[in-house]
Amino acid sequence: MIKVAVTGALGRMGSNIIKTITQQEDMKVVCAFEVPNHPKKGEDVGELIGIGKIGVPLSTADELDKVLKETKPDVLVDFTIAHACVENVKIAAKNGVNLVIGTTGFTEEQKAEIEKAIKENNVAAVISQNFAIGVNIFFKTLEFLAKKLGDYDIEIIEMHHRYKKDAPSGTALRAAEIIKANRGIESVFVYGRYGMTGERKKEEIGIHALRGGDVVGDHTVIFAGDGERIELTHRASSRQAFVNGVILAIRYIADKKEGIYNTFDVLGLNEIKF
């Protein structure tokens, strides 16, 4: 039985992850965390997310070290915010807990802190901007298109619900990084355009963020050539698409001894070569 800790437990992703874990035969939630001084501290997490009692009281982030020592989870799943995630990773890694990290919006310095904590404590982690299985097929397809159509004009458009705090999305940035690594020419990211921008430069990859309504996550990459264009789109209609990938990542990382992995590793996509 895989024992799982969840931070951001009452958030949109955290609550859905907990619900789905309770439906699995090979894993269980042993502790769940929210922000310090949360008014629901101590209440049963299952009741708070509407699935009935599961025997796990809501803890707060300032108790993370103590509760991890008491419950001894195999994996901690983090969908919080960047600065909180960095601290959670440091504490979990020191306790020998493997990690599934879906938080986005990190600075380069924060990414380095996370990698350092994982490596220094010899734990294993799956880190991904998007755990949806379809999105990762989308990413793999982008590798192919960027290699074949790298000289086309490339634009990325993403849209999310009005509550999303960071822009552009981690998924859009990951798409841009994949294209940059595979298109065969130097690339620069251009975030939106306004005013007299001048003629579009060949090396540009445009990235545009839209916010509104209850959109779970839409991503489109446009490869525009002379007389034709290809548009590759992924639309998530439910957060369950992401949660299903998280469950696979938990199983993948639970017994790993060390190392940093991504969803391509989890899904076996690194074996596909173009």
UniProtKB/Swiss-Prot annotation:
<feature type="binding site">
    <location>
        <position position="161"/>
    </location>
    <ligand>
        <name>(S)-2,3,4,5-tetrahydrodipicolinate</name>
    </ligand>
</feature>
<comment type="function">
    <text>Catalyzes the conversion of 4-hydroxy-tetrahydrodipicolinate (HTPA) to tetrahydrodipicolinate.</text>
</comment>
<dbReference type="GO" id="GO:0008839">
    <property type="term" value="F:4-hydroxy-tetrahydrodipicolinate reductase"/>
</dbReference>
<feature type="active site" description="Proton donor/acceptor">
    <location>
        <position position="160"/>
    </location>
</feature>
<dbReference type="GO" id="GO:0019877">
    <property type="term" value="P:diaminopimelate biosynthetic process"/>
</dbReference>
<dbReference type="InterPro" id="IPR000846">
    <property type="entry name" value="DapB_N"/>
</dbReference>
<dbReference type="InterPro" id="IPR036291">
    <property type="entry name" value="NAD(P)-bd_dom_sf"/>
</dbReference>
<dbReference type="GO" id="GO:0051287">
    <property type="term" value="F:NAD binding"/>
</dbReference>
<dbReference type="GO" id="GO:0016726">
    <property type="term" value="F:oxidoreductase activity, acting on CH or CH2 groups, NAD or NADP as acceptor"/>
</dbReference>
<keyword id="KW-0521">NADP</keyword>
<dbReference type="GO" id="GO:0009089">
    <property type="term" value="P:lysine biosynthetic process via diaminopimelate"/>
</dbReference>
<comment type="similarity">
    <text>Belongs to the DapB family.</text>
</comment>
<feature type="binding site">
    <location>
        <position position="34"/>
    </location>
    <ligand>
        <name>NAD(+)</name>
    </ligand>
</feature>
<dbReference type="InterPro" id="IPR022663">
    <property type="entry name" value="DapB_C"/>
</dbReference>
<dbReference type="GO" id="GO:0050661">
    <property type="term" value="F:NADP binding"/>
</dbReference>
<dbReference type="InterPro" id="IPR022664">
    <property type="entry name" value="DapB_N_CS"/>
</dbReference>
<feature type="active site" description="Proton donor">
    <location>
        <position position="164"/>
    </location>
</feature>
<feature type="binding site">
    <location>
        <begin position="128"/>
        <end position="131"/>
    </location>
    <ligand>
        <name>NAD(+)</name>
    </ligand>
</feature>
<feature type="binding site">
    <location>
        <begin position="102"/>
        <end position="104"/>
    </location>
    <ligand>
        <name>NAD(+)</name>
    </ligand>
</feature>
<dbReference type="GO" id="GO:0005737">
    <property type="term" value="C:cytoplasm"/>
</dbReference>
<dbReference type="Pfam" id="PF01113">
    <property type="entry name" value="DapB_N"/>
</dbReference>
<protein>
    <recommendedName>
        <fullName>4-hydroxy-tetrahydrodipicolinate reductase</fullName>
        <ecNumber>1.17.1.8</ecNumber>
    </recommendedName>
</protein>
<keyword id="KW-0560">Oxidoreductase</keyword>
<keyword id="KW-0220">Diaminopimelate biosynthesis</keyword>
<dbReference type="Pfam" id="PF05173">
    <property type="entry name" value="DapB_C"/>
</dbReference>
<keyword id="KW-0520">NAD</keyword>
<feature type="binding site">
    <location>
        <begin position="8"/>
        <end position="13"/>
    </location>
    <ligand>
        <name>NAD(+)</name>
    </ligand>
</feature>
<keyword id="KW-0457">Lysine biosynthesis</keyword>
<dbReference type="InterPro" id="IPR023940">
    <property type="entry name" value="DHDPR_bac"/>
</dbReference>
<keyword id="KW-0028">Amino-acid biosynthesis</keyword>
<keyword id="KW-0963">Cytoplasm</keyword>
<feature type="binding site">
    <location>
        <begin position="170"/>
        <end position="171"/>
    </location>
    <ligand>
        <name>(S)-2,3,4,5-tetrahydrodipicolinate</name>
    </ligand>
</feature>
<comment type="pathway">
    <text>Amino-acid biosynthesis; L-lysine biosynthesis via DAP pathway; (S)-tetrahydrodipicolinate from L-aspartate: step 4/4.</text>
</comment>
